[in-house]
Amino acid sequence: MARSFKVLSPTAILGYGFPEESFRKAMTESPDLIAVDAGSSDPGPHYLGAGKPFTDRAGVKRDLRYMITAGVQNNIPVVIGTAGGSGAAPHLEWCREIIHEIAREEHLSFSMALIPADVDKAIVHQALDNGKITALDFVPPLTHDAIDESTYIVAQMGIEPFQQALKEGAQVVLGGRAYDPACFAALPIMQGFDEGLAMHCGKILECAAIAATPGSGSDCAMGIIDDNGFTLKTFNPKRKFTETSAAAHTLYEKSDPYFLPGPGGVLNLKGCTFKAVNDGEVYVSGSKHEETPYALKLEGARRVGFRCLTIAGTRDPIMIAGIDKIIDEVKTSVSRNLSLDDDSIHINFHLYGKNGVMGDHEPMQTAGHELGIVLDVVAPTQEIANSVCSLVRSTMLHYGYENRIATAGNLAFPFSPSDIQGGPVYEFSIYHLIEANDALRFDFHIEQVTPEGVQA
């Protein structure tokens, strides 16, 4: 009898949700693994830098309750990658506390492995000095200042830490920052299934049913791996996998359609095929894993200031026609009044209805009949950001631009108060590869979780 391995991906990110009916149907197929890629760098550097999640706690707890309860009651491993959204120490602890609450409320007992992804700054400094760090495309070379200024530094772990935790008997594995497919692929590879097929399956399942048609990150998907390929399926009659949808998601967030790099290897898709089978299912084969020198992607973020912003609008055709000149004159006036002579204060305008999404790359040069104006000020302190934003906003509100007819305010504000304090602003300070000779150097520990708490 042909062997297979069933991987259930309930949702694209913990907290995004999924229909209970889809999850119930998936569980009737007796999955061998429940896994979720719980985070992403897509929401930007703030969440890594601030050590905060970008998903709602209640939503994350709801999703985890289904997953942990079903996994423990049916003796199915539950593997979570990039816990808490960014996978640094505070994110891992945040997710751990939620799981402890679920165990108490659902009267569950299980062993849980915690795999931090944080990297000591001293290790990064030494690697930089030894020439063991390289920048990714379009990223400047790493500096010692960038390392020191980063609030958290994490490395994207591969499959090996997950495998080691599972080998030591963990029922639930809670990992820090991880390569997206790793949490899906670790166990099937450990059980002897082809690494290329398992990694490709994980690449698609990382976003759950987004790869189906119509796609949704808030619905379940399953990958069934065998010795020759894997089958993709959903559990919602509204969604189906197609050859096109599965192939398209394989290219998701990738610059090369044939070679997808990861920790310790490259996924070679030159011989990959997608074939529709049954009703709404797709069979994928031909994916190959090729070993490369082991490297891990480092991510770090540092604080660069504080933000204050204002949202406003105008539909005056005279103002819209001259908006670029008006903005330049307003900036000049404010800079003169505040004696701004350094680069520590940044004043930006985002003009929705003109080029708010693409900026200078916008090919359509004709503005609409109205503009949504987002004024964004970043300064060294919150107080300075507030003051500059207030002055820019009031200056633009009453600015006497060329051919102006009205003498009242130039802007319409949807909210009162108009100015919004955005708090600390972060930027990615580290987005580099570090050579790693030991793929298993992510330390982890296993704790026994019970309804009464953690047992030593």
What are the roles of these predicted feature ranges?
Residues 109-127, 353-355, 412-422:
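Short, conserved secondary-structure transition motifs
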Residues 119-175:
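An acidic, phosphate/nucleotide-engaging active-site surface
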Residues 294-456:
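C-terminal non-catalytic interaction/assembly regions of soluble proteins
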Residues 29-46, 69, 74:
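N-terminal glycine-rich anion-binding loops that anchor highly charged ligand groups
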Residues 2-10, 35, 77, 183-354:
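Small-residue-enriched flexible segments
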Residues 13-15, 40-42, 83-93, 177-183, ...:
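Gly/Ser/Thr-rich loops at beta-strand to alpha-helix junctions
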Residues 1-28:
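N-terminal amphipathic/basic leader segments beginning at the initiator methionine
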Residues 53, 76-87, 172-173, 372-378:
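Short glycine-rich or small-residue beta-strand-to-loop segments that form or flank ligand, phosphate
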